[in-house]
Amino acid sequence: MGRIRQTFIKRTGEELIEKFADKFTSDFEENKKAVEEVAMISTKPLRNRIAGYVTAKVKKMNA
């Protein structure tokens, strides 16, 4: 079983996908940079978790 993501991460990821859908791809490294550009995330681990969530959502949408 996988880890359950916090509501804050899910909510932020969903909002970023809605507003900036064209910036995100299925590549985690690119999404890290995109999250850093468009959102004011205070810590690196939080940025990485949000980028990971966005990456998973994009992969699901494209599958």
UniProtKB/Swiss-Prot annotation:
One matching Pfam family: Ribosomal_S17e
Lineage top rank: taxon: Archaea
Entries under InterPro entries matching the protein: Ribosomal_eS17, Ribosomal_eS17_CS, Ribosomal_eS17_sf
GO-annotated biological processes: translation
Keyword terms, alphabetized: Ribonucleoprotein, Ribosomal protein
Gene Ontology CC annotations of this record: cytosol; ribonucleoprotein complex; ribosome
Molecular-function GO term, any one: structural constituent of ribosome
Transmembrane segments: none
Keyword Lipid biosynthesis included in the entry's annotation: no
Sequence similarity: Belongs to the eukaryotic ribosomal protein eS17 family.
Name listed for the protein in its UniProt record: Small ribosomal subunit protein eS17
